[in-house]
């Protein structure tokens, strides 16, 4: 893989955790810093080894939260497996640092990270979860199909439109993440109204 020019790898950062981390299916990580102001620590997750187990993951999410992954297509698999892998890393690191001694918050951004939020919520409910959306997936689809989103917002039902526009899986995941998150946020008043109508939870 082509190296990221903004990532500076380190063999000493978090080395004690990395040395003992037992991640599933031979999952690999790289640890370093982003080469930006503040130089934050970052863990890059290689999630390719989890692809053969995606149906097991989707079955768990259906049984626990009713997330319907059967009609999924496009970028759904990649997003879900990445976010699950990231949640597994959070879980591993939390246990290593004995996270119960701290107030830990895990922030998940957009539907693409929703499955990670749901995994953390199930395995480590003591971690506070924050879910942010910049626009709902079904709202984007409504507008992208040439339908007037905001002019008739009050008349739309998110679940119904997801069926009509073949967005069931993404909408199902996003709606579940929004409802299960300890704190649900968005970026504007108009998007908050969109969330209230289409996801049936008003942002906090």
Predicted regions and their residues:
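Catalytic cores of nucleotide-sugar-dependent glycosyltransferases that transfer UDP/GDP/TDP-activated
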Residues: 1-204
């Amino acid at each position: 893989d082509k190296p990221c020019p903004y990532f500076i790898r380190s063999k000493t950062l978090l080395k004690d955790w990395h040395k003992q981390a037992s991640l599933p299916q031979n999952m690999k990580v790289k640890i370093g810093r982003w080469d930006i102001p503040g130089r934050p620590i970052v863990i890059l997750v290689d999630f390719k080894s989890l692809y053969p187990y995606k149906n097991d993951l989707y079955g768990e999410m259906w049984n626990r939260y009713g997330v319907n992954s059967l009609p999924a297509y496009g970028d759904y698999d990649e997003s879900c497996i990445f976010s699950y892998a990231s949640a597994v890393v959070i879980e591993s690191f939390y246990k290593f640092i004995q996270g119960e001694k701290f107030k830990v918050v895990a922030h998940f951004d957009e539907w693409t990270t929703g499955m990670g939020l749901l995994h953390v919520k199930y395995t480590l409910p003591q971690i506070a979860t924050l879910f942010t959306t910049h626009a709902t997936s079904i709202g984007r689809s409504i507008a992208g199909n040439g339908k007037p989103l905001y002019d008739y917002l009050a008349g739309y039902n998110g679940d119904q439109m997801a069926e009509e526009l073949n967005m069931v899986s993404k909408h199902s995941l996003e709606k579940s993440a929004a409802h299960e998150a300890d704190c649900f946020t968005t970026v504007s008043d108009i998007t908050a109204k969109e969330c209230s109508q289409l996801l049936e939870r008003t942002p906090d």
